[in-house]
Amino acid sequence: MTQTPTNPRERLIVALDVPDVAQASKLVATLDDSVLFYKIGYQLAYAGGLSMAQDLIGAGKKVFIDLKLHDIGNTVASGVASIAKLGATFLTVHAYPQTMKAAVEASRGTGLKILAVTVLTSYDEADLKEAGYSLGVADLVAQRARQAQAIGIDGLVCSAEEAANLRAIVGEGLSLVTPGIRPAGSAVGDQKRVMTPARAIAAGADYLVVGRPIVAATDPKSAANAIVAEIAVAH
């Protein structure tokens, strides 16, 4: 069974969605001890971000590598093994059975936790229909969540809109990691299924991934602290 961190600051994951290590390092220095957990995605990973991940881990931070792996089993397993050596806490894979099975098996005994991406938070019903899916967002997310749990995945990446339903489906056995978090008054951007921090926690999210509302803020540290404060009082 997974355990939700008792320290609200450990439940905030800041997405380092910047183009290079120099900007990311500057942001991390600005945020200082207000943030303990960072996410590194495609943009930064391919610009030196994986080396930076090692530095962050060495400095006592936690790192979530968001590469959404999806390939043949051997290739996924090799990628998982490489990421595990970095000392990362989380790694994402797409929620396809063969991909999840390979990732879970490769992560055994490493300390790396595998998160399955159910449906991207930038997708809505129309997007799924255009891509050829017959199921709607809620049904597809539920189907993939059940498959992920049966395979032994550690957690799910889902929008806050699906969190309550997923918690009912998977119980307390999986961590729910929720992107698309926007404090009241923030721009939605390219996300289509968004929610405030307090509402996301109330819906059952264990971790909140926040990018632009902190990264693009005039005062990133104050923005991060405000979200942590909101997490602390949410129920």
Curated annotation (Swiss-Prot):
Main enzyme class: lyase
Disulfide bonds: none
Keyword line: Decarboxylase, Lyase, Pyrimidine biosynthesis
Keyword Lyase: yes
Pfam families xref list: OMPdecase
Name by which UniProt lists this protein: Orotidine 5'-phosphate decarboxylase
GO molecular function: orotidine-5'-phosphate decarboxylase activity
Coiled-coil zones: none
Function summary: Catalyzes the decarboxylation of orotidine 5'-monophosphate (OMP) to uridine 5'-monophosphate (UMP).
Any single Gene Ontology cellular-component annotation: cytosol
CDD domains with a match to the protein in the record: OMP_decarboxylase_like
One GO term of the biological process aspect: 'de novo' pyrimidine nucleobase biosynthetic process
Catalysis performed (reactions): orotidine 5'-phosphate + H(+) = UMP + CO2
